[in-house]
């Protein structure tokens, strides 16, 4: 901090939407006091994108998919000065703000993953009924009946765990529900990835093209952080 301003230096990957021409303001989280208690070192502040020292370095494709000008980018902040009044809630409350978003954000991605898993299962079933191998539809080969059944079971398990996590977040709060949130963050994306893998097998060579959208669906697997 310098007087009534904060001077920001750093580099940030995965800055969401900053290349979109409609993006005029960024919310920046950074370390404001390294000597404070562990969870009070970070702060969040509003930074207008036209502030001197703000540089969009590059767009970041994910698994080769390029969503520019949307998606994510790398941003460099070089002696960026912003008024102290732009600070959210107060100095040292950045982690607190972030935690209020992470739980709901993660369960939101799990809901999306379940929806994509349903759509992927539909594509797989349609493909299995329309494609033939050894003189009969692939769906008639026993291994695919087992895979379809397993996919349905896993989707329902993921849906129920997501609903339980959401119920607990509403009734007892995110802190008490943190175990359920963590569990569904692991379960839903892994369920999706398993179903996508089977769907790619069902589509043959077409499964690895962009024609069926299966590769893009894989991007949800690591949404909002890794699951390990």
Where are these regions (language model features)?
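Structural alpha/beta core scaffold segments of enzyme domains
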Residues: 1-2
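Short, solvent-exposed loop/turn segments at the edges of secondary structure
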Residues: 21-23, 40, 70-72, 213, ...
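Flexible, small-/acidic-enriched active-site or ligand-binding loops
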Residues: 52-79
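Short, charged, solvent-exposed linker or helix-capping segments at domain edges/interfaces
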Residues: 39, 55-58, 84-91
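A short core secondary-structure module
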Residues: 5, 9-57
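Alpha-helical interface subdomain recognition
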Residues: 5-6, 74-80, 90-95, 99-223
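A short, hydrophobic C-terminal helix/tail in secreted or cell-surface proteins
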Residues: 224-228
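Short alpha-helix boundary/capping segments
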Residues: 18-21, 37, 65-69, 102, ...
């Amino acid at each position: 901090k310098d007087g009534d301003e904060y001077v920001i230096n750093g580099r940030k990957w995965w800055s969401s939407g900053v290349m979109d021409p409609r993006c005029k303001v960024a919310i920046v989280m950074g370390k404001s006091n390294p000597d404070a208690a562990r969870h009070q070192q970070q702060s969040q502040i509003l930074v207008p994108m036209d502030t001197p020292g703000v540089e969009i370095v590059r767009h970041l494709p994910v698994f080769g998919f390029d969503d520019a000008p949307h998606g994510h980018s790398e941003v460099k902040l070089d002696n960026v000065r912003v008024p102290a009044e732009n600070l959210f809630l107060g100095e040292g409350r950045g982690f607190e703000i972030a935690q209020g978003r992470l739980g709901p954000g993660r369960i939101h991605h799990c809901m999306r993953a379940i929806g994509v898993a349903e759509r992927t299962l539909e594509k797989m079933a349609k493909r299995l009924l329309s494609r033939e191998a050894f003189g009969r539809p692939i769906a008639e080969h026993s291994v695919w009946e087992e895979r379809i059944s397993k996919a349905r079971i896993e989707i329902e398990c993921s849906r129920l765990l997501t609903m339980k996590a959401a119920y607990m977040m509403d009734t007892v709060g995110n802190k008490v529900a943190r175990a359920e949130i963590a569990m569904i963050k692991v379960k839903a994306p892994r369920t999706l990835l398993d179903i996508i893998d089977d769907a790619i097998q069902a589509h043959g060579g077409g499964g690895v093209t962009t024609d069926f959208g299966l590769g893009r669906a894989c991007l949800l697997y690591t949404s909002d952080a890794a699951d390990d």
